[in-house]
Amino acid sequence: FYIMFAFRQVPHPFRYGASAVVAMMHDITIIFGFIAITGLLFGWEVDALFLTAALTVAGFSLQDTIVVFDRIRENTRRYPLEDYETLVNRSVLETVHRSLATQLNAMFVLVAILLFGGASIRHFIAVLFIGLLSGTYSSLFNAVPLLVAWEKRAEAA
């Protein structure tokens, strides 16, 4: 509901919120699948650190999606005559550098902690790493195309 409120100036704010939630659920599904596979292969268990990692991944994913959607909102006002697909593509191209730089910086730190940190947090770091990979992917390649497809379908109807 926060995204609907934050994007209330754009047409159909519910679509922004629903697209962000779908992308976040994709990331949560990926890390639950990861922990299920590692549980079968290596005996990893769901514990408090896993839940902390899951919430952190959800936050990172949602924040990254909000940044892209905010740029779409800004460009909607800046380029009112541009068709929606072109505007969204422009917005993604303007934010992809920021998204990748932020996620790569976090991943470099996670790799360093994974290599040099203690064994007690390795599961946490591995889940965070997979979740950040998934979050970067889903905010750019799940949430945004879903939003565009929803808008195109509404225009066609």
Where are these regions (language model features)?
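Membrane-embedded alpha-helical bundles that form the substrate/pore pathway
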Residues: A23, D27, V57-F60, D64, ...
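Internal alpha-helical transmembrane segments of multi-pass membrane proteins, especially GPCRs
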Residues: A18, V92, V96, L100, ...
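Hydrophobic transmembrane alpha-helices and their membrane-interface caps
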Residues: F14-R73
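Membrane-spanning helices that line or support transport/gating and their immediate boundary helices
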Residues: G17, F32, D64-R71, N75, ...
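Alpha-helical membrane-embedding segments
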Residues: E45-A58, P80-L87, L110-G118, R153-A157
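Helix-loop junctions and hydrophobic alpha-helical segments within the transmembrane domains
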Residues: Y79-S99
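Hydrophobic, glycine/alanine-rich multi-pass transmembrane helices and their short helix-loop junctions
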Residues: Y2-R8, A101-A149
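Membrane-interfacial segments
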Residues: F5, Q9-V10, T38-F42, V46, ...
